[in-house]
């Protein structure tokens, strides 16, 4: 049923894209939008991981890396992937002070995971394991394809809505709704389509985040470390550390373990992620059910040693 709902929501995104095409070019524009949407989905299927990793400047790493933090990150991720019955994913690092992580790829055989330098510097080894187990859960559940295709279509809807705003009223009366009516429709689609696309993203992403938290805790064998990690990441992400690439590509925000957007404007009203405290509570309940002690509240400072070898942090 969860997969059925996801496919229905993806169909809704495609319908929104076609609606924007109709306002721009009538029936012809709608058909062109449909063909374009299908082409985007096919392109995303084969190139999703490459596009996202290139966008964020991800660098592939392995066990031979000279930095101990990165070596441990690779070793633990490979070990957990093996224990979860997954092929070895491409393991990458992105140069960002904001602590965060994501997974991408069309299937487990073509999956990639990424952790930011900020995350590796902030968290303990056990907490990093918890985060990467969450990302491996997305791979195991085959969420990565849906999440990347959703990002592609949602981003295209926003771009097409802006195009509709400027050109939607230029058709004549015989061209299916030109003039004032077409302009009003174009204005409405420019305002409402990105919001609708974001709401669909939220519906897809939120349910999958809870499930990835649950499966991730099983993969890591530890719900407490993931709960602490989420608390730390949330605190630091809201402490003034912007993810520049995510701000430029907001349609990819739902791919991260914590919303990477700064919360300016409407971002804080239309979050693509469940509230972190709700996720932590769910993990706490899971820990109690598994016989673990309840996760303690994370400290707002870290004793981890950054990649530079010097201690530091947002408030140091």
Swiss-Prot record:
Residues 295-316 are annotated as: Disordered. The chain crosses the membrane at residues 16-36, 149-169, 180-200. It is a multi-pass membrane protein. It is an enzyme of class 3 (hydrolase). It holds the Pfam family Peptidase_M48. Binds 1 zinc ion per subunit. Keywords: Cell inner membrane, Cell membrane, Hydrolase, Membrane, Metal-binding, Metalloprotease, Protease, Transmembrane, Transmembrane helix, Zinc. Its cofactor is Zn(2+). It is found in: Cell inner membrane. Its EC number is 3.4.24.-. Zn(2+) binds at residues 134, 138, 209. GO terms for biological process: proteolysis. Belongs to the peptidase M48B family. This is Protease HtpX homolog. It comes from Caulobacter vibrioides (strain NA1000 / CB15N) (Caulobacter crescentus).
């Amino acid at each position: 049923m969860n997969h059925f709902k996801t496919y229905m929501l993806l169909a809704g995104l495609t319908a929104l894209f076609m609606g924007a095409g109709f306002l721009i070019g009538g029936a012809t524009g709608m058909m062109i939008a449909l063909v374009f949407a299908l082409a985007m989905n096919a392109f995303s299927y084969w190139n999703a991981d490459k596009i996202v990793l290139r966008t964020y400047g991800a660098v592939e790493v392995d066990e031979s890396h000279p930095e101990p933090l990165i070596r441990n990150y690779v070793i633990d991720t490979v070990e957990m992937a093996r224990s979860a019955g997954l092929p070895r994913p491409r393991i990458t690092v992105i140069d960002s002070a904001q602590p965060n992580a994501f997974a991408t790829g069309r299937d487990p055989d073509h999956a990639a995971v990424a952790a930011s330098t900020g995350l590796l510097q902030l968290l303990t080894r056990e907490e990093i394991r918890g985060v990467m187990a969450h990302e491996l859960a997305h791979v195991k559940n085959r969420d990565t394809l849906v999440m990347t295709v959703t990002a592609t279509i949602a981003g295209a809807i926003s771009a097409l809505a802006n195009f509709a705003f400027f050109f939607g009223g230029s058709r004549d009366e015989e061209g299916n709704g030109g003039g004032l009516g077409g302009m009003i429709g174009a204005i409405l689609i420019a305002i409402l389509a990105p919001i609708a696309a974001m709401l669909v993203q939220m519906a897809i992403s939120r349910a999958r985040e809870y499930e990835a938290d649950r499966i991730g805790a099983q993969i890591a064998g530890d719900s407490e470390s993931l709960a602490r990690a989420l608390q730390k990441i949330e605190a630091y992400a809201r402490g003034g550390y912007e993810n520049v690439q995510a701000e430029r590509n907001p349609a990819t925000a739902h791919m991260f373990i914590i919303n990477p957007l700064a919360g300016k404007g409407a971002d804080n009203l239309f979050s693509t992620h469940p509230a972190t405290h709700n996720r932590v509570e769910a993990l706490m309940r899971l820990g109690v059910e598994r016989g673990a002690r309840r996760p303690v509240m994370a400290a707002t400072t870290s004793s981890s040693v950054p990649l530079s070898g010097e201690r530091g942090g947002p408030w140091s």
